[in-house]
From Swiss-Prot:
Glycosylation sites noted in the Swiss-Prot or TrEMBL record: N254, N310
Protein name per Swiss-Prot or TrEMBL: Heparan-sulfate 6-O-sulfotransferase 1
Source species, domain of life: Eukaryota
Regulation: Inhibited by dithiothreitol and stimulated by protamine.
GO BP terms: neuron development
PTM annotation, UniProt: N-glycosylated.
Length: 401
C-alpha cells in the first residue's frame, strides 16, 4: 500500500514538473483568452488615466484638440522631425526608426548612423529625421530652415515626376525650460558646440556681428553655469521659441530690425501658432502620453512602450533658488511657450482618451445587444406554431356539449 502511494505521488509530481517546463517554453507565446470569453484588455492600460480635476488654462477649439490624421505611408506623406537640442529627441528619433511596427521596417545596420526607411511600395523615404536622412538641412535645423529646405532636399533625393506633391507632417518634442537649459549647459561643458549649425534664414546665414560667439577657441568646455548664463548671445536662451518661430518675421538674427519687446512678442506668438499647426508634439516629462498621442495621430503603433527616465544629467545638477529664477528670466519666452504647450498637450490627451472611452462603451453596448439577439433567435426558431382547431373538430365539441 505504501509503495503504491509512493508511486502515485511520484507520478503527480512528475506531471506537475512536466507541465511547469511546458509552460516555461510555450506559455509566453500562447494567446490565452480572458475569462468569460471577453477580449483581453487593450493597450489603454499602458497609459495614465486623465486627471478628472485638471483645470484648463487656455481655450482650444475642438479642431485644435482633434489630431487623427490619415497618414498615407504608401502615398506621398512625409513625417518631418524638428529636433530641438536636449529635449529627448535622440531617444524619440531612435523610436521612430527602430520601434515602430511597420509593414516594411526601417533598415538599421550596426555601425551606420542612418537607417533606410522606405515606403512599403517603393524605394522612397517617409521619414525626414536625423536617423533616416541625416542632418540634410543642417545640424538641428529649426522651423525656419526645415520649411524652406525639406521639399528641395527630398525632390533631389526622390524626384517627384508626375506624381502629386508631398504632404509634410511636422513633429517635435518640448521640455521644461529650466531642465533643458541645465542639460544644454552640461553638454556644452563637456565640449559640444553645434558650431556646424547653419542658422539659415531668408537665404543667408547670420553675420559674426549678428551672432557673435560666446567663447574663444574650439569649444566652451569647462565653462561654469555663471559663464554660460552671462553670455548675451547664448542661443540656449529661449531656444525652443526661436527654433519653432518663423524668424523671417523679425528680421532673422538682426536684432536692430525691430524693438526688442516687439521682437519677443512676435517670436512667441509665431512659435505658438506653428506649434498648434504641427501634426504632433510631445513633452519629455510625459513619455507615455507622448507615445499615446503619436500613435493615435498617425495610426502607427510602437513595439515597446516608452519609458520615463527622470534621472537625467540635468537632474543631477544642484542649483539654488536664485539661480533657478535667473534661468527662468533668461528663458521667459520658453517658460510661456511651455506653459501654453503643456496645457494644449494635456487637453489633447484628455480629449482623445474620453473620445476612445465613449466609443468603447458604444461598441460594448452594440456587442451586448447583438449577443442578446443571437440568444433569442434559437428559442423563436424551435417554437412550434399553435394548432388551429378545424371546423369539424369544433362542430364535434359543440355537439357533445
Amino acid at each position: 500500500m505504501v509503495e503504491r502511494a509512493s508511486k502515485f505521488v511520484l507520478v503527480v509530481a512528475g506531471s506537475a514538473c512536466f507541465m511547469l517546463i511546458l509552460y516555461q517554453y510555450a506559455g509566453p507565446g500562447l494567446s490565452l483568452g480572458a475569462p468569460g470569453g471577453r477580449a483581453p484588455p487593450d493597450d489603454l492600460d499602458l497609459f495614465p488615466t486623465p486627471d478628472p480635476h485638471y483645470e484648463k488654462k487656455y481655450y482650444f477649439p475642438v479642431r485644435e484638440l482633434e489630431r487623427s490624421l490619415r497618414f498615407d505611408m504608401k502615398g506621398d506623406d512625409v513625417i518631418v522631425f524638428l529636433h530641438i537640442q536636449k529635449t529627448g529627441g535622440t531617444t524619440f528619433g531612435r523610436h521612430l526608426v527602430q520601434n515602430v511596427r511597420l509593414e516594411v521596417p526601417c533598415d538599421c545596420r550596426p555601425g551606420q548612423k542612418k537607417c533606410t526607411c522606405y515606403r512599403p511600395n517603393r524605394r522612397e523615404t517617409w521619414l525626414f529625421s536625423r536617423f533616416s536622412t541625416g542632418w540634410s538641412c543642417g545640424l538641428h535645423a529649426d522651423w525656419t530652415e526645415l520649411t524652406n529646405c525639406v521639399p528641395g532636399v527630398l525632390d533631389r533625393r526622390d524626384p517627384a515626376g508626375l506624381r502629386s506633391p508631398r504632404k509634410f507632417y511636422y513633429i517635435t518634442l518640448l521640455r521644461d525650460p529650466v531642465s533643458r537649459y541645465l542639460s544644454e549647459w552640461r553638454h556644452v561643458q563637456r565640449g559640444a558646440t553645434w558650431k556646424t549649425s547653419l542658422h539659415m534664414c531668408d537665404g543667408r546665414t547670420p553675420t559674426p556681428e549678428e551672432l557673435p560667439p560666446c567663447y574663444e577657441g574650439t569649444d566652451w568646455s569647462g565653462c561654469t553655469l555663471q559663464e554660460f548664463m552671462d553670455c548675451p548671445y547664448n542661443l540656449a536662451n529661449n531656444r525652443q521659441v526661436r527654433m519653432l518661430a518663423d524668424l523671417s518675421l523679425v528680421g532673422c538674427y538682426n536684432l536692430s530690425f525691430i524693438p526688442e519687446s516687439k521682437r519677443a512678442q512676435l517670436l512667441l506668438e509665431s512659435a505658438k501658432k506653428n506649434l498648434r499647426g504641427m501634426a504632433f508634439f510631445g513633452l519629455t516629462e510625459f513619455q507615455r502620453k507622448t507615445q499615446y498621442l503619436f500613435e493615435r495621430t498617425f495610426n502607427l503603433k510602437f513595439i515597446r512602450p516608452f519609458m520615463q527616465y527622470n534621472s537625467t544629467r540635468a537632474g543631477g545638477v544642484e542649483v539654488d533658488e536664485d539661480t533657478i529664477r535667473h534661468i527662468e528670466e533668461l528663458n521667459d519666452l520658453d517658460m510661456q511657450l511651455y506653459d501654453y504647450a503643456k496645457d494644449l498637450f494635456q487637453q489633447r490627451y484628455q480629449y482623445k482618451r474620453q473620445l476612445e472611452r465613449r466609443e468603447q462603451r458604444l461598441r460594448n453596448r452594440e456587442e451586448r445587444l447583438l449577443h442578446r439577439s443571437k440568444e433569442a433567435l434559437p428559442r423563436e426558431d424551435t417554437e412550434e406554431p399553435g394548432r388551429v382547431p378545424t371546423e369539424d373538430y369544433m362542430s364535434h365539441i359543440i355537439e357533445k356539449w
